[in-house]
């Protein structure tokens, strides 16, 4: 198998996966569906049923780059029991996985390999960026490390930390499940670039801003 190594441009546009430029393409029967109240309700029920199935059976791809991968695999132990969320079935092939967790440092030489693995995944597919290195390069501000995996992949959920705890990974699964529940994809048997509606999820920092500001008693390191 031949690989082509390409240099990631830190300040360049995401030309391969222009997520922000996606347009929603209407299904040919969409206008007829919305003319009927019954068919409109049926369409909404079908979307909810499909999204419920996708959100409760997320199969991760067994892939890791660095120490964050160890924290990810820890969540599969009996202590955390990630099987409660239907995400315990680790797939060894990207063609059988639903989402990829980029856990670790994305080196420039590894970027085209990660991109190729992402291309081999079938739709619908999602990406979780786990750890400071995957989010922004972390402490490796150097030419050999891509400063954020979102330079060459569309990322759905970011997990901060160096490294994040397994509980943070489980919270990311819940956020991804919530995001999937609000998605709208064409209910068609035709596979193609038909456009996908993704909900604009509020970041956890903004959502908990009022709660953080209201804190008056700061705990010491021994109390945490």
From Swiss-Prot:
Binds 1 [4Fe-4S] cluster. GO terms for cellular component: plasma membrane; respiratory chain complex I. The keyword Mitochondrion does not apply. Keywords: 4Fe-4S, Cell inner membrane, Cell membrane, Iron, Iron-sulfur, Membrane, Metal-binding, NAD, Quinone, Translocase, Transport, Ubiquinone. It catalyses: a quinone + NADH + 5 H(+)(in) = a quinol + NAD(+) + 4 H(+)(out). InterPro entries: NADH_UbQ_OxRdtase-like_20kDa (IPR006137), NADH_UQ_OxRdtase_20Kd_su (IPR006138). Its EC number is 7.1.1.-. [4Fe-4S] cluster binds at residues 67-68, 133, 162. It is an enzyme of class 7 (translocase). GO terms for biological process: aerobic respiration; electron transport coupled proton transport. The keyword 4Fe-4S applies. This is NADH-quinone oxidoreductase subunit B. Its cofactor is [4Fe-4S] cluster. It is found in: Cell inner membrane.
């Amino acid at each position: 198998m031949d690989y082509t190594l390409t240099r990631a441009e830190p300040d360049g546009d995401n030309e391969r996966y222009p997520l922000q430029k996606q347009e929603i393409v209407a299904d040919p029967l969409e206008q007829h569906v919305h003319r009927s109240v019954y068919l409109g309700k049926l369409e909404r029920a079908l979307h909810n049923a499909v999204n419920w199935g996708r959100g409760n059976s997320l199969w991760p791809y067994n892939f890791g780059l660095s120490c964050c991968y160890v924290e990810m695999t820890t969540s599969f132990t009996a202590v955390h029991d990630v099987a409660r969320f239907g995400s315990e079935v680790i797939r060894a092939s990207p063609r059988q996985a639903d989402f990829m967790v980029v856990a670790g440092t994305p080196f420039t030489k590894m970027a085209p390999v990660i991109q190729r693995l992402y291309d081999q995944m079938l739709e619908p597919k999602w990406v979780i960026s786990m750890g400071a290195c995957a989010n922004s390069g972390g402490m490796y501000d150097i030419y050999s490390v891509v400063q954020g995996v979102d330079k060459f992949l569309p990322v759905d959920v970011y997990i901060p930390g160096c490294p994040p705890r397994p509980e943070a990974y489980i919270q990311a699964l819940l956020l991804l499940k919530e995001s999937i529940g609000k998605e709208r994809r064409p209910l068609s048997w035709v596979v193609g670039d038909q456009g996908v509606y993704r909900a604009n999820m509020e970041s956890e920092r903004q959502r908990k801003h009022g709660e953080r500001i209201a804190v008056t008693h700061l705990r010491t390191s021994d109390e945490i």
